[in-house]
């Protein structure tokens, strides 16, 4: 079966809580549409290079609060899995570097949920570090499980097997009073889905700073992207990502 790379880009204005997540929003200082289009082009090229499908979802389906919840459809709609046995989700502020290897060939397991290493979870030891990860819905879970399963949800690979294991918990998303990232981690913990830990270079935040190693996928995550926007654009252009 084929592999697929999926992005979502739907105007938040079409939802009941458009300000729920303002990390990628048009303003007089930031062309979010242009930024997201550049991300999509990078993954379309990446998918074509390795003969995978690329799908950009631009119409709402779940229609719950904000477009960030739309990715739960990957668990809920059986039609995805009639054609694919693996789907990689990527945020619309993630960019595939031209020389990035084929992630599906790098991590071949079809029985696990594949997420990137994330030190904020795996290496949290100080009280202030633990407070950042062990709250909300996750406060109901054991800290060791939160540290083990925790990940940054801007990049992940969902296999059909993992989808089937996690689905009963993802189905509860409207009943869970927390953000989508916590719901994903909670579903991992509750389902005890087997994990594959992928290299952080497939979800790397500060690639545009000098001295940082070459990454495979650059994630311009968080509000700091607006502070460093010029530097980010320079970095992308040097990589040939227009």
What does each of the following model-derived ranges do?
Residues 1-73, 77-84, 221-225, 234, ...:
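N-terminal anchoring/stem segment of glycosyltransferases
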Residues 57-58, 93, 143:
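Catalytic phosphate/metal-binding cores of nucleic-acid and nucleotide-processing enzymes, i.e., regions
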Residues 146-241:
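Catalytic core and acceptor-binding pocket of nucleotide-sugar-dependent glycosyltransferases
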Residues 44, 104, 185-189:
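Non-transmembrane alpha-helical segments in soluble domains
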Residues 35, 62-90, 97-106, 113-116, ...:
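A conserved donor-nucleotide-binding helix/loop in the catalytic core
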Residues 84, 109-112, 193, 213-215:
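Short, high-confidence coil segments that cap the C-terminus of an alpha-helix
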Residues 95-141:
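Conserved donor-nucleotide/metal-binding helix-loop-beta segment in metal-dependent transferases, i.e.
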Residues 15-32, 123-143:
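Charged, glycine/proline-rich intrinsically disordered loops and linkers
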């Amino acid at each position: 079966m084929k592999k697929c790379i999926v992005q979502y880009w739907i105007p938040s204005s079409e939802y009941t809580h458009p300000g729920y997540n303002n990390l990628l929003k048009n303003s007089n200082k930031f062309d979010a549409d242009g930024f997201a289009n550049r991300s999509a082009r990078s993954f379309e090229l990446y998918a074509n290079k390795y003969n995978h499908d690329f799908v950009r979802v631009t119409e709402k389906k779940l229609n719950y609060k904000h477009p960030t919840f739309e990715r739960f459809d990957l668990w809920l709609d059986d039609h995805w899995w009639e054609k694919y046995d693996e789907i990689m989700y990527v945020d619309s502020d993630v960019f595939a570097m031209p020389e990035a290897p084929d992630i599906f060939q790098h991590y071949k397991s079809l029985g696990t949920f594949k997420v990137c290493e994330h030190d904020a979870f795996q290496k949290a030891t100080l009280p202030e570090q633990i407070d950042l990860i062990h709250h909300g819905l996750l406060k109901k879970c054991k800290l060791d499980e939160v540290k083990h399963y925790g990940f940054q949800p801007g990049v992940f690979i969902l296999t059909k097997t993992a989808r089937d294991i996690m689905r009963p918990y993802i189905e509860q998303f409207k009943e869970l009073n927390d953000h989508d990232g916590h719901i994903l981690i909670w579903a991992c913990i509750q389902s005890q889905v087997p994990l594959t830990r992928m290299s952080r270079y497939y979800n790397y935040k500060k690639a545009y700073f000098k001295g940082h190693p070459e990454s495979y996928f650059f994630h311009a995550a968080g509000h700091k992207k607006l502070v460093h926007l010029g530097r980010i654009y320079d970095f992308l252009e040097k990589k040939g990502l227009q």
